[in-house]
Amino acid sequence: MTDDKDEQHHFPGPGTLDRAVRLVRFLRENCPWDAEQTAESLIPYLLEETHEVVDAIQDGTFHDLEGELGDLLLNLAFQIVVAEDAGTMDAESVYRRLEEKMIRRHPQLFGGGEHPGWEVLKARERPPHEGVLSGLAKGLDPLTKSYRMQERVASVGFDWESYEGAWDKVAEELAEVRGAVEANDPAAVEEEVGDLLFAAVNLARLAGPHPTTALSRANSKFQRRFSRLEQLARERGISTKSAGLEVLDGLWDEVKQEETEG
């Protein structure tokens, strides 16, 4: 990349991250708790704040989202300052790596030709001796890891031609789960359920929705509906513990009808 391009595509200037980094430096200089934190000790807070950001997005509570994004920004700034103190990196080097990556991954914007696709670009960045599935984050949840693996192998042509093939695979795996259950074989049940979930993730990938997003919304929908079921039961003096499935199923249908009409 030439000096002209570096100048053309650089986005300089102080911003929110710089202010957050300065705030964390002040905290570490003046607060014993902040001063003793390490990259490892901060991991639980980073994960918690990430989940809270996701919750606020999915709940549509944008006032809460503003606060949660601030908490997440603080955690990111904290990691940068801890690394600065250890002499391994600083905010400028973090940003420079980000900027260089985005320029590589948006060739259509920065004079590098047409965009060949995300997985193709990321494959070019991997060392030639590494396999297509190398480098996946160890902390990925199983659904996302399945999704990413299937994305990557698809980039080298190992993929169904359409979602129909994935749909048939789901049906095949479902039948195998049933066979394992009926054979009363716990080890086989575990294996076949895993295969079924893996196939369902692939179907989701080809059909459109990200499986983690789809499952998260399904969880939220179930939680909302069952909470309403419990509310109806309380209003009618019904104990959910002793009501029985028929009564609970009737309340469940009422809740779904309310949502349909409402």
Model-derived features: positions:
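Flexible "arm" and connector segments at domain edges
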Residues: M1-E68, L74-V193, L197-G262
